[in-house]
Amino acid sequence: MAKIQMKTPLVEMDGDEMTRIIWKMIKDILLTPYIDLKTEYYDLGLEHRNETNDQVTVDSANATKKYGVAVKCATITPNAARMTEYNLKEMWKSPNGTIRAMLDGTVFRTPILVKGITPYIPTWTKPITIARHAYGDIYKNVEMQVKAGSKAELVCTDKDGKETRELIYDFSNEDGIIQGVHNRDESIASFAKACFNYALDMKKDIWFATKDTISKKYDHRFKDIFQEIYDNEYKEKFEAAGIEYFYTLIDDAVARVIRSNSGYIWACKNYDGDVMSDMVATAYGSLAMMTSVLVSPDGVYEYEAAHGTVQRHYYKHLKGEKTSTNSVATLFAWTGALRKRGEMDGLDDLIKFADNLEKATIQTIEEGVMTGDLAALSTLENKQKVDTEEFLLAVNERLQKLM
């Protein structure tokens, strides 16, 4: 069988630990036998980021802007323990944070539903998509540890050199910590438009929530920009489509989501989306059953898994032990990127391949072949727990029948 041809390369961002192992397995077992795979490769593994002073992350984001579609493996965001483990020059920032800031996009995360795995919340019968603002807030922060006797102020200098000062806290008798965060009106507006456009495309209601009663300038600015754009540009379109935009406070939103009937888009600020996407994914069954795509205002797409590097399984792998690691989210990152590349380049065969690979993956699970995390959740009677590679081989068997 002739391999499916590609016109334009995908930007391929390799990653860390167990997901890096899975990344290669997916390519070897499910992609390269069928596709003449064209990628522009960037190694975002922590060791290489350290070697390049994180320049490789910047280069990969610029390549994504150039080519339009990227697929990214999960990566380590270093903490103090990782500094020691990898002998790092410095505590490098999150690659995702860097890429999202450079692309200024919105992250849409949607659970993958399969028969036999019932959400922990029985009323959730349809997917809840989390739309996460991908710029700013604590992910582009500046922070300091301060010593007793210090005074922390927020200072803004305008274009004429005039300073506006606000006292944050007087640390006269104690040590402490401070943090500065920011966002841009333009980025918030892009986020709002991306959410409203996605809601129209999917024909789903959209919710948005902040804490504007406490954060009367910062969070309230998000609320105001969303409302202004909705009223001026989207209200009539939403009414014609029979969908609605709903704003509430973030704590009220959490309560409403838990008791809801699902099936809508929940727009969240950056940190809220980071946290709530994990909560929603886990409530549906597994964080490894969640698609994630970053969409920029100028139509650039970056697909990734919505979970981490699976450190515990990686250490088992290094000892030569078999792991049963769920590869579905990483697999769907590849299918999402290949499908989008096919759509952009007019390659029907590539689109069909991505569709078939997703069908084969879901079919494998629904026929009872799955990794340990799903086996613990599945209500299917004749289920079989398999290891990481065995699952991908089982998917390949079904893919061959669909091709």
Regions found by a protein language model. Name each.
Residues 2-8, 18-23, 27-53, 61-64:
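N-terminal alpha-helical transmembrane segments of multi-pass membrane transport
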Residues 6-25, 154-248:
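Glycine-rich phosphate/diphosphate-binding loop of Rossmann-like nucleotide-binding domains
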Residues 36-41, 202-210, 234-247, 342-354, ...:
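Flexible, glycine/charged-enriched surface loops at secondary-structure junctions
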Residues 46-60, 223-264:
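N-terminal small/polar loop signature for handling phosphorylated ligands or for N-terminal nucleophile
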Residues 47-159, 163-164, 271, 275:
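N-terminal glycine-rich phosphate/adenylate-binding segment common to multiple enzyme folds
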Residues 134-135, 140-192, 199, 344-347, ...:
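Glycine-rich phosphate/pyrophosphate-binding loop and the adjoining helix
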Residues 257-356, 363-367:
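Glycine-rich phosphate/nucleotide-binding loop
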